[in-house]
Curated annotation (Swiss-Prot):
PANTHER family the UniProt entry points to: ASPARTATE--TRNA LIGASE, MITOCHONDRIAL, ASPARTYL/LYSYL-TRNA SYNTHETASE
Residues engaged in binding L-aspartate: 174, 220, 458, 499
Chain residue ranges for the region called Aspartate: 198-201
Taxonomic path: Bacteria, Bacillati, Chloroflexota, Dehalococcoidia, Dehalococcoidales
Coiled-coil regions listed: none
GO annotation, biological process: aspartyl-tRNA aminoacylation
Subcellular location: Cytoplasm
GO cellular component: cytoplasm
Domain of life: Bacteria
Function, in words: Aspartyl-tRNA synthetase with relaxed tRNA specificity since it is able to aspartylate not only its cognate tRNA(Asp) but also tRNA(Asn). Reaction proceeds in two steps: L-aspartate is first activated by ATP to form Asp-AMP and then transferred to the acceptor end of tRNA(Asp/Asn).
InterPro entries per UniProt: Aa-tRNA-synt_II, aa-tRNA-synth_II, aa-tRNA-synth_II/BPL/LPL, Asp-tRNA-ligase_1, Asp-tRNA-ligase_1_N, Asp/Asn-tRNA-synth_IIb, AspRS_core, GAD-like_sf
Protein name (Swiss-Prot/TrEMBL): Aspartate--tRNA(Asp/Asn) ligase
Pfam family membership, one: tRNA_anti-codon
Amino acid sequence: MLKTHSCALTQENVGTEVTLAGWVHRRRDHGGVIFIDLRDREGIVQVVFNPEQSAACLDIGKELRSEYVLQVKGVVSHRPAGTENNRMPSGMVEVVAVHAKILNAAKTPPFYINEEVEVDESLRLKYRYLDIRRQGMKNNLIIRHKAVRFMREFLNDQGFIEIETPILIKSTPEGARDYLVPSRLFPGKFFALPQSPQQLKQLLMVAGMEKYYQVARCFRDEDLRADRQPEFTQLDMEMSFVDEEDMMKLMEDLFTGLVANVRPDMKYNKKFPRISFADATEKYGCDKPDLRFGMELADITDIGASSAFGVFKNVAAQGGAIKAISAPGCGGYNKSQQEELINLAKKYGAAGLVPISLGVENGELKDLTMEMVKSVAAKYLALEEIKTIAERSGAKPGDLILIVAGARKMVNTVLGEMRNQLAVKLNLCDKNELSFAFVVDFPLFQWDEEGKRWDSVHHPFTAPLESDMPLMDTDPGRVGSRAYDVVCNGYEIAGGSIRIHQADLQRKVFHLLGYNDEQIDERFGHLLEAFEFGAPPHGGVAPGIDRFVMLLAGETSIREVISFPKNQAAQDLLFGAPSVVDDKQIRDLHIRIQAEKE
């Protein structure tokens, strides 16, 4: 080894002769004595080049610049009194160099490595190997390593075995577009990269493996956003002879144990509340609610229906919904600020937004007067009606009530989005808190108005509630599913369900989704045939590793916890991928590039 110790030296190492190797983090010339901060993965330590110890070392010290790779030998010493640095873990000690060797020089980096300054993300991704040298990215990857290591150890202790499944599989579209791989040996035929190992892990249950897991790479050719990548990693799990309670207990123990081991400084709930899908959408406007703050959606349809406000009366008469949320402390918003909120509501599909300001002074709701209320709706609503709206939405004097009216689904979506954005703007979320919950009681199917057909809410392998089986023939929209999601801080961090394990029931679900028998047999025949050989009852779940590590690290994009991510256009800026390949490779694959029509 070119080093005997890491740079994470402490007072316990005083008097020890060490050989270190790392990167020059900073260099300071103090009139004949040169100081550098030497950095490796474990830490940073000050190294002193003093001519009284070694003139040759001083000469090397004069050559050093930021990011040079250096080997240095010396003795760990206490720093002189008054020069200690309490901001560094190694700030009480230094290494006095007696031998030094430059292992490699370095060009000037395109951005500072030794400062956590904001750098354009495209530049960071192009030079990701330099970006990872920075403390924030390095810490994120270490958190990821610790999280994955805990997951493996936890599941091993629970009797699971890790089994790898193929990356080249058959294309059986499950929602998103597949990444296709043309076969050279079978012209005109294609493999697909797995969107998840869903069918493979179910086949492992048929095979009698009972408890399986895998740190699985998954691929989906879909539009990107902050928490999506074309390739991502999930902790894939499946168990035989279990029900929903077993799987939810496993998830609760896994996530709480993980936080306790990897980020014990974070606040988290050890028992996960259960929220029905219906309650989640009605109270929070989405099926992955952030429970770190209140601001629940309040239904005020009955108040609007009996009020003198024509807009509200019409919506209620047509079977629509009228709902409100309270923005705490925003009663003093001016016209421009309120207009900004109105435009935000319109962006998400609302025809408009009705703000009701309860004044700028904090106080009790019982003390509210009409003089304090500022709103275009004030002349149509009685004081008692406004007080009731305030009471339901949790508003008090000094707050701003925001009301949306229209189709119920739209109202929930708009206020749900506004709730989340206002929470960020008003600093209502504690970044150091993880608020877990289970979302349950999902419907099995949802109607696709555009395609005029039923879709799976989760995926087509999710089992229906046994009590709802008769409804599959008469009213599929009312069939409940045996699905369970884990949500945290406004993200779905794990989705799971008890699976269908009978061939006839699985075929029936496919029929409801619009597949004919020929399509079913061509795409899923292998699975249905396997179910005829004694498939056990089974269920599974797949926590998203990228997304949960993002929350553990306090980040807002999964790109911050992936070593070499794609950008939001699904491009790899470091390698320049996707890229053009030569004509011979194209011909060997028996494919032809067709120019896109303008």
